[in-house]
Amino acid sequence: MRYFAEKLGYGDEVDFWGMVGLLHDIDFEMWPEEHCVKAVPLLQEAGVEERMIHAIVSHGYGLTPTAAEPDHEMEKVLFACDELTGLIGAAALMRPSKSVQDMEVKSVKKKFKDKKFAAGCSRDVIRQGAEMLGWELDKLFEETILAMRTCEK
């Protein structure tokens, strides 16, 4: 998320975007069936500002009944990339390098088309996220790979 903040001209909000990225799945491991629902009271109790809570919860749009539609560019990026990072991460593990450093868009496209590969990663959500951003899938794939490379160093 920090990569995207810089790339999209939100350099003054890099830490905010990064924190949203770190916290977005705060409730998933303990309450997968209530993902993006349990996050709200957890984050409120921790004193997290409402703007950040909204951003975190919005990545569950369409998947959980309480998640608002992403409206800020950051929320759209998180929505689009959440499922995609799972697919790219799984694809990286299949490579000899086990890394995204040598990952290419064409490799992601091939895995994206194979519905059995990383089947839990919703291709529909990825497509919807790209549409929200006004991006072609190739651009989303490329930028997400580049973002993941910065986290892997």
Label for each model-derived stretch:
Residues V100-M103, S107-K153:
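A structured, mid-to-C-terminal "fold-capping" secondary-structure block
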Residues Y10-K115:
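Divalent metal-dependent catalytic cores for phosphoryl transfer on phosphate-bearing substrates
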